[in-house]
């Protein structure tokens, strides 16, 4: 794709000015410490073919990007029918933490797995008798996807999110009242906040993107580690719901499957080609990485990545 890393480095430098226009997620105290000037990217093509630029070695927590991985694991654990009996498939124009549609929809279930209510319901379906067992299975799945067995969660971020998870608590109790979840709410929130606090760098995340981009195949062996139908479900939700209530605009301007998190990370993929990870913690008003989106838009236009 690029003959030299310097080409990608130059594009990153051109987009770095946009970091000044965003703000970090201050409502989660541990995330408020992030350096707003950070911008890094990794593009993984399989095997040893990887290009990185900028601050690609900086670690970040997955936050809402973890919803993609948890959904894949839940689909493997309980199957498509069970998952979508509790969670819908439709996009929403509401913010990711909104409760309004839950109150008016019949039956009262979350519209999709990418909003917080839907993600809580999905995490509830990951098999495990305890939080530790479910989290261990999720981490093992991530280790298989990344080939990095050292990945774990950031305890400080997890505790910070657990202590301030007032809205997610209310969402969870609402879901429990309507039979969408069965778990103890505090145990579910413990699992969910640790899931969101799983920490890695751009290279790890880009490798995960490669697996989903290439129909669930391991980049080293070519063996399918995620079933084809699961990889397709994941890619579809990334297109329709992956960028919160800016998913439509992102589809038009960038045109590739992507999932963002309030840490400032974005997982993106070019189907049948690349896995891409971008990190820049300065967010726009909808909770997406401002410079990260600008970087992906620039690259997509330059390389004609759009699937539309």
From Swiss-Prot:
Signal peptide: none annotated. It comes from the Bacteria. Its EC number is 3.5.1.2. Homotetramer. Keywords: Hydrolase. One of its GO terms (biological process) is glutamine catabolic process. PANTHER family: GLUTAMINASE. Belongs to the glutaminase family. Substrate binds at residues 64, 116, 161, 168, 192, 244, 262. Gene3D superfamilies: DD-peptidase/beta-lactamase superfamily (3.40.710.10). GO terms for molecular function: glutaminase activity. This is Glutaminase 1. It holds the Pfam family Glutaminase. The gene is glsA1. It catalyses: L-glutamine + H2O = L-glutamate + NH4(+).
């Amino acid at each position: 794709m690029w003959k030299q890393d310097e080409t990608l480095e130059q594009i990153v430098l051109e987009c770095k000015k946009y970091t000044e226009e965003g703000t970090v997620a201050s409502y989660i105290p541990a995330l408020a410490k992030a350096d707003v000037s950070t911008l890094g990217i990794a593009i993984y093509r399989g095997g040893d073919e990887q290009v990185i630029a900028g601050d690609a070695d900086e670690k970040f927590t997955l936050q809402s990007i973890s919803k993609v991985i948890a959904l894949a694991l839940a689909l493997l654990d309980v199957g498509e029918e069970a998952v979508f009996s509790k969670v819908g498939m439709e996009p929403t124009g509401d913010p990711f933490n909104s409760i309004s549609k839950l109150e008016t929809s019949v039956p009262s279930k979350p519209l999709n797995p990418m909003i917080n209510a839907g993600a809580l319901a999905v995490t509830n379906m990951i098999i495990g008798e305890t939080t530790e067992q479910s989290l261990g299975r999720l981490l093992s799945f991530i280790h298989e996807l990344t080939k990095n067995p050292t990945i774990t969660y950031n305890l400080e971020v997890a505790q910070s999110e657990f202590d301030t998870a007032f809205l997610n608590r209310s969402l969870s109790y609402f879901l429990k009242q309507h039979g969408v979840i069965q778990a103890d709410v505090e145990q579910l929130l413990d699992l969910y906040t640790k899931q969101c606090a799983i920490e890695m760098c751009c290279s790890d995340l880009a490798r995960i993107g490669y697996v989903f981009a290439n129909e669930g195949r391991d980049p080293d062996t070519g063996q399918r580690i995620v079933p084809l139908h699961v990889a397709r479900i994941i890619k579809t939700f990334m297109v329709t719901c992956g960028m919160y209530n800016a998913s439509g605009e992102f589809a038009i301007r960038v045109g590739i499957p992507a999932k963002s998190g309030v840490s400032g990370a974005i997982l993106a993929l070019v189907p049948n080609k690349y896995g891409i990870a971008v990190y820049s913690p300065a967010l726009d008003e909808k909770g997406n990485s401002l410079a990260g989106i600008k970087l992906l838009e620039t690259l997509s236009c330059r390389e004609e990545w759009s699937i539309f």
